[in-house]
Amino acid sequence: MAVTLSLLLSGRVCAAVARCGFATRGVADPGPIGREPDPDSDWEPEERELQEVKSTLKRQKKAIRFQKIRRQMEASGAPPRTLTWEAMEQIRYLHEEFPESWSVPRLAEGFDVSTDVIRRVLKSKFLPTLEQKLKQDQKVLKKAGLAPLLQQLRGSGNTSKLLPAGHSVSGSLLMPGHEASSKDPNHSTALKVIESDTHRTNTPRRWKGRNKEIQDLEESFVPVAAPLGHPRELQKYSSDSESPRRTGNGALPSDQKLEELKAEEPGNFSSKVVQRGREFFDSNGNFLYRI
């Protein structure tokens, strides 16, 4: 009788505990100790979500700590600009028209800057005035040692030939190719190359030097009157030995040298000179010189 009463009371207590929600896995479903939890149970997904939230918070704290240390180590304010406004417009144009070909790393490599600078340029929507553009370009070119070039461009009123970056200075400027079609992959990254003014300023000097050399050469080819009295008669030399007998500056050999050559090759010389246009030949038809 006592055993039956105790069993009845224990059963009622277990039922009451189960109704109140305090039943445990061991009481409801007794089993061996150390068994792995059932993946189909109700509390497994909640624990999994809790772990994901904890890992996310940990990553966020780590990122915040890294940004804080970075701000402490770097200089305050925005970094100094190393690109001209023309280069910034090129970056925006290339990234907008050809985003696949000109990604952020590709632009950073092409303009010799960091990816943070490229992202700042793409994110910025600031529209400066002409004075602000010239002031910024002057700072960039002064840092690159090209301030005289900027003064020359400002004097001519042409600011479209400024160099793209202060670090890498080249003889040409890359401009977006408006004629390039985005349909053709071969021309998707076409660029128009404009020569720098530094090459053009050297061209007149080279031509001036060449013209002076030609003028001196023509003056050295004035015919010398021979003792026979003919205006076109002079002492001649063979055309085969013309180049080695000339002096270093392109003038004809001296009279003494001509006498020596005449003594060495007496049969090849003649006292008659025939002019054909600007070319002179001897009586045997051998070419002498050209004026």
Swiss-Prot record:
GO annotation (BP), single: cell differentiation
Q: Phosphoserine-modified residues are where?
A: S41
**Is the Phosphoprotein keyword given for this protein?**
yes
Instruction: List the residue ranges of the region (Disordered).
Output: 27-49, 224-270
Keyword Secreted attributed:
yes
Note the coiled coil stretches, chain numbering.
none
Q: How does it assemble?
A: Forms a regulatory protein-RNA complex, consisting of RCC1L, NGRN, RPUSD3, RPUSD4, TRUB2, FASTKD2 and 16S mt-rRNA. Interacts with 16S mt-rRNA; this interaction is direct.
Family, according to the entry, reads as follows:
Belongs to the neugrin family.
- What is the recorded name of this protein? Neugrin
Gene of this entry: NGRN
